[in-house]
């Protein structure tokens, strides 16, 4: 299997993107493993992950949460494939979700990991949104819910699954 993606998504007609930088308490190796092998530890519903950390290999996972307070929880499938993997440094993957996310568009998430004296600087770029509304909603979820929750779970101060958006 090639270590290069067979096709990188064309994002030219979907110019909206987001960038989030955050200091994480976990070290780069712990974060790399979490993003490539342990989605069900911090993000996905338990037992709802099919993922092999190899370039070009498709993955699938589900999250489960209520979209609005007081409504029943629903399942939210996520699909993708790894585009680039550099252990303990970089993860790049495609990210496809439904309504309230990428609306079926194949977007690209790039996670860059830089070691710090205590922890890691994580830079997340998520590109390929059709409009600013989808970008803004996804940015808020990454910034306010998902990444803080990941930091808590990986350092032993939180539990999975993550809180609802």
Predicted features and spans:
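Hydrophobic ligand-binding cavity/cleft-lining segments
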Residues: 1-50, 54
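Short, solvent-exposed aromatic-acidic interface loops
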Residues: 94-100, 125-132
